[in-house]
Amino acid sequence: MSAQAQMRALLDQLMGTARDGDETRQRVKFTDDRVCKSHLLDCCPHDILAGTRMDLGECTKIHDLALRADYEIASKERDLFFELDAMDHLESFIAECDRRTELAKKRLAETQEEISAEVSAKAEKVHELNEEIGKLLAKAEQLGAEGNVDESQKILMEVEKVRAKKKEAEEEYRNSMPASSFQQQKLRVCEVCSAYLGLHDNDRRLADHFGGKLHLGFIQIREKLDQLRKTVAEKQEKRNQDRLRRREEREREERLSRRSGSRTRDRRRSRSRDRRRRRSRSTSRERRKLSRSRSRDRHRRHRSRSRSHSRGHRRASRDRSAKYKFSRERASREESWESGRSERGPPDWRLESSNGKMASRRSEEKEAGEI
């Protein structure tokens, strides 16, 4: 990669897809299914194992450092759960690697001579010491490259101790089997990267293997897979707790709403009972008022009839007394007139008739006035 391409990639990684206003690059978002989620989390095997004996070639999905920068910015604000996709990808890759390791072990078991369990255990011990020496040498070289010379020297001293143990283990292994068989190269399969390791490999060969890009790449992938499994488990546990808390809150709200609804119904019922009670009271009051008004009307009518009856009775009695008085007075006048007529002799009949008419008219007028 040229220096210009490296600078461009660095700018993409730092500033994202919108670093220079290129709209064509912004058409593909990091959430697109075509984007490699393992690349966004910096654990894609196609990137890690590039340039090794197990180079996988170019990934079928989009790899873009700018999209990774966009994802890192967005993941600080909300959880996108891309770890689950990356974990599935790495699990399938590691499962394939483990399958190749088992096949290599079967081929070695078929091609190499059968040895006893005791000899096999001694050979396995030599392999383990070789692996430890190779890891320590690789670590010492890494520390020396970083400038930690003192730490590197300490690790080299540990390497010398392990070499002494390895020499003793090789002597035990050599003495436990014939010389012809011992000279035969005994191989084993690396449990990390499925590469072949020899029992008699020198330290340089072991350091190159355990410090090589292939072995370290597989270590990185396996460690990243363990980290993703732990992260996914924690997030799933957190999500389950959040879901449980939301469900409890929802149930509590439903209980509160049911309680408030029952209280509302009780209040409605009490209000309806109060309305019915007030309505019945008002109805009874209306009825009592109506009955009292009816009784007062009956009493008033009765009193009116009584007063009218008494007034009629008094008027009739007054009429009867007036008639009786008038008849007595008339009788007395007639008697007095008859007595006077008998004393005076026969009067003039015309005068008598006129006087009688006048007297009768006066009596009628008087009677009418009294009535």
Swiss-Prot record:
Segments of this protein annotated with the region Disordered: 232-371
Q: Is Coiled coil a UniProt keyword of this protein?
A: yes
What residue spans carry the Basic and acidic residues bias annotation?
Answer: 232-257, 318-351, 361-371
Q: Which InterPro entries match?
A: Luc7-rel
Q: Which residues form a coiled coil?
A: 87-177, 218-259
Q: Which domain of life is it from?
A: Eukaryota
- Positions with biased composition (Basic residues): 258-317
Give GO terms: molecular function aspect only.
identical protein binding; mRNA binding; RS domain binding
Record PTM Phosphoserine, positions in chain: S332, S336, S363
What does the record say about tissue specificity? Ubiquitous.
Q: Give me the Gene Ontology terms describing cellular component.
A: U1 snRNP; U2-type prespliceosome
Q: Name one Pfam family in it.
A: LUC7
Keywords annotated in UniProt? Coiled coil, Phosphoprotein
Q: Which GO terms describe its biological process?
A: mRNA splice site recognition; negative regulation of striated muscle tissue development
What is this protein's function? May bind to RNA via its Arg/Ser-rich domain.
Question: What family is it from?
Answer: Belongs to the Luc7 family.
What protein does this entry describe? Putative RNA-binding protein Luc7-like 1
